Curated annotation (Swiss-Prot):
SUPFAM superfamilies: Homeodomain-like. Controls the genesis of the spleen. Binds to the DNA sequence 5'-GGCGGTAAGTGG-3'. Pfam families: Homeodomain. It comes from Homo sapiens (Human). This is T-cell leukemia homeobox protein 1. The gene is TLX1.
Length: 330
């Protein structure tokens, strides 16, 4: 394909416009940035954006796609030119210009009446031939300030087709799903053995008046057990029900048995203590009292000494007295 420059596309413009960021930064006056087109061949940075046919309002698809002389990858200026597909936004294509990276951009404005932004039907055409040279580490000002939508000529990622059986999996149920549902239900409803019988509500405790309690205690002191007729008569006299009188006597008998058992145990322990005390006192008295003299031992010194012998006694006077008595008998 023959490379068509911006001046061929727009013959009405006599002089192409070219500018560079280094000229803007280094030139003392603002108008000096517009230099000749010979700066296109300067490969200082290697990154260029060809403006010829780039900023064309109503420039048409052919101008946008072929403005770089390369394969117009993203051309959206109209129904389509010989260099790239049709589109409506910006156009960028890699071209064989001097430098490592050469990006040709064609940004078309609103579509004109002459076939999607053509020069014949557009409001006006602005054409500039030049290179915007930007270092690799500097972002493009135009691309950052005015982001353009991606062109229709971009290579689209093919959509993954839906699996034929995915929609059918929603209706499937697995055993672990059933167990999980059952476990969740048991957590909220409780175990079936717990729900078999509802919990019984505790009845409030019945309170009796002091007069009723006094009459019941008197009757219980006289009679621990009541017959049916006696219980009915007592309940009628105290304005109580038969069940209340029966329950009160049952509880009172239980309390009486417990108190009686405790009292009996206390009496038994006290009797044991008294018995031990009496035995100890009797033993002490038996040790303190002297044994009566045997008439046979009085005449026999040996028997007398054996009778009065007390090995557990430490009193030496008794031993001397025994020896003296034995010597006297001899």
């Amino acid at each position: 394909m023959e490379h068509l420059g911006p001046h061929h596309l727009h013959p009405g413009h006599a002089e192409p416009i070219s500018f560079g960021i280094d000229q803007i930064l280094n030139s003392p006056d603002q108008g000096g940035c517009m230099g000749p087109a010979s700066r296109l061949q300067d490969g200082e940075y290697g990154l260029g954006c060809l403006v010829g046919g780039a900023y064309t309002y109503g420039g048409g698809g052919s101008a946008a796609a072929t403005g770089a002389g390369g394969a117009g990858a993203y051309g959206t200026g109209g129904p389509g030119g010989p260099g790239g597909p049709a589109g409506g936004g910006g156009a960028c294509s890699m071209g064989p210009l001097t430098g490592s990276y050469n990006v040709n951009m064609a940004l078309a404005g609103g579509p004109g009446p002459g076939g999607g932004g053509g020069s014949s039907g557009g409001a006006g055409a602005l054409s500039a031939a030049g290179v915007i040279r930007v270092p690799a580490h500097r972002p493009l000002a135009g691309a950052v300030a005015h982001p353009q939508p991606l062109a229709t000529g971009l290579p689209t990622v093919p959509s993954v087709p839906a699996m034929p059986g995915v929609n059918n999996l929603t209706g499937l149920t697995f055993p672990w799903m059933e167990s999980n549902r059952r476990y969740t239900k048991d957590r909220f409803t409780g175990h079936p053995y717990q729900n078999r019988t509802p919990p019984k509500k505790k009845k409030p405790r019945t309170s009796f008046t002091r007069l009723q309690i006094c009459e019941l205690e008197k009757r219980f002191h006289r009679q621990k057990y009541l017959a049916s007729a006696e219980r009915a008569a007592l309940a009628k006299a105290l304005k109580m029900t038969d069940a209340q009188v029966k329950t009160w006597f049952q509880n009172r008998r239980t309390k009486w048995r417990r108190q009686t058992a405790e009292e009996r145990e206390a009496e038994r322990q006290q009797a044991n203590r008294i018995l031990l005390q009496l035995q100890q006192e009797a033993f002490q008295k038996s040790l303190a009292q002297p044994l009566p003299a045997d008439p046979l031992c009085v005449h026999n010194s040996s028997l007398f000494a054996l009778q009065n012998l007390q090995p557990w006694s430490d009193d030496s006077t008794k031993i001397t007295s025994v020896t003296s008595v034995a010597s006297a008998c001899e």
